[in-house]
Every structure is written in C-alpha cells, then in structure tokens.
Amino acid sequence: MFHRRFMVDMNMYKKMHPAQNENALEKASHNRGKHSHVDSSIGEIDVDMTQDDPPSDDEFLMCLPSTVKGFDMKNKEWRLLEVAFIQRVEWNDKAFEDLVIEPRTKSLIKAVVTNRVRSEEGADVIEGKGNGLFILLHGGPGTGKTLTAESVAEIAKRPLYKVTCGDLGTKAHDVEKYLETVSLLGKTWGCVVLLDEADVFLEQRSLANLERNALVSVFLRVLEYYDGILILTTNRVGTFDEAFKSRIQLNLRYTNLDRDQRLQIWTNFVKRLEEMEVSSQQISGSYGINAAEIRASLSALAGENLNGREIRNILSTARQLSSYEEKPLG
C-alpha cells in the first residue's frame, strides 16, 4: 500500500495561516461567552506534565481531534488529515543500498551525511551564519542524481523537501520569499532540501543578464544562513559562479551509465516488480509477472544505451500493456 508522507505541525500551520488562527480564536471566545459557567481550562494539558512521562503514540492520537492539518511533502500544501489513519514514517534504508552509482561515491555520500546527522556543529562558527551541508550532483539525465537525494533523506531519516525552479518563479522578490519559506520549514523540520535542476543559480554571473544575476544573489544570501542538508542537482554546469565554490562541501559528477550499471538497474527494477506483485496479489487487475523470462533477457536489455529514467519508463509502460492485455508481464 502506498503511504504519502505528511508533516503534522500545528504550531507551524498557525504561523503560516495567522488569519485562520485569529478566526478560530474569535469563535472559541464567542462560544465561551455563551457558556461562561464552563471552566475554560478544562481539556487543556500542561506541557510540563508530558515531559517526564510522554504518552505512547496511541495515547497521544487519542488526545487529538478527529482531523488535523498536515503538510503534504510531495505536493507542498497543507491538507486535512484523518487522525485514525496517521502512522509513523517507515524509512526505506534499502533505497540507498540499491542506488547504482560508483561504490566510492556512495561511501563518501553516506559518510558525510551520517556525520552531519550525528553532529549539529559545523566548521563555520560565526554567529548567525549557517552550518549546512551542501552537496552538488551534476551529470546527464537519468544517471541517478535525484534518486541519490531521495535515498539520502531515507538514510538520514529526515523528510525530503523537493523544490524545482518552476516552484520558485522568475522574479527575484518571489524567489527570495519562496526560498525563505523553504529555509524555515527545512530548519524547523530537519528536512533534506532538494533543489532539482538548479542550473540558473549555479552559472557564473555576467553583465549581460542582470535579472539572472539578481536570482543568483538572492539564492546565495539565503544559502549563507541555511544550516540543514541541501542537495542541488543539474544536468549541465558551464562555469561555476565563484561564490558557490566555497559553499559546496561535496561536488560529485555523474557519468552516463555503463553496461554493468544498466544491468544492475534492470535487475533492481525486476526485483521490485516481484515484490510489488506479492503485495498486490489480492488487487483486481494484477496479472502476474514472468520474472524468469524477463531475467533471461536482461543481458541483452543492458546492452541498450538507456538511462535509469528510460528503463523505469519502459517497465512502467510494459506493466500497463500487461494489464490492458490481461496477461502476465514477461
């Protein structure tokens, strides 16, 4: 079953929606006026009471109303959630294990991320300055950059906040406002922030494009004071802006996949399809998978010059065709 991830933080919701909070307070005050004989403190819990003996998850959920606001980490919007269906996130450590990149690169990423999570202290001790971990992943499409960022969030056991340039807008003022919100949420919730396709922020500034220069300056200013984990990905890097070089702790280039890597990706996807099939056997519309037949073709398939995204899309299309024709995938 697919589980979407939400951050339940009523304090942050109230900060971001002050008008709604004021309306709720006015309504509560009006109701108390109608029932003045009722002690307004009834139902309130002193925070200190829960420090020494924190309630279990089930006990805590019983104290909540039937619905609460939660921030959808995928769509980046607040949604009304039914408390009865809320459960803790199950982190997928296997995602990083299955990541198909150079072993040394994988070890390096895991080392710096693990050390960052273990320690909240950074090398820059200037008051007010950020002590963030900034990682740049650059290379062609479908080479594993975005998947690396998603896997890092899993091993760090932190929510992933994914931002694309389309989210940011094109005006410096809008970009700054959006990035400040991302920075606030990222710091408060301990997120791994992914800025996907960050080309516009990384290339060297020039006199020929003042509008883009303003965007780069805004990004650098926000970056200066961010103290979380930030991963930037780009398909191309021409000339780095000099201001970024001292801020990026880990700069990794992703090359096109070789045959062995493509074979491993095919193998991982087939294994995942088998696992999905086991969990969905009771679901109508599932017609099975002929894994042995597919595996017999993997060597030939790995010889095709495809990237990871193309391999995923091929298998996704094959599953849809299998369902449409009502026969096993293979």
Model-identified regions with their sequence ranges:
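AAA+ P-loop ATPase mechanoenzymes
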Residues: 1-122, 132, 169, 242
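Intrinsically disordered, low-complexity sequence elements enriched in Ser/Thr/Gly/Pro
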Residues: 2-3, 30, 234, 260, ...
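Generic detector of ordered secondary-structure context
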Residues: 65, 100-104, 211, 310, ...
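Walker A/P-loop NTP-binding motif of AAA+ ATPase domains
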Residues: 95, 99-295
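Conserved AAA+ ATPase small/helical "lid" subdomain
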Residues: 252, 273-330
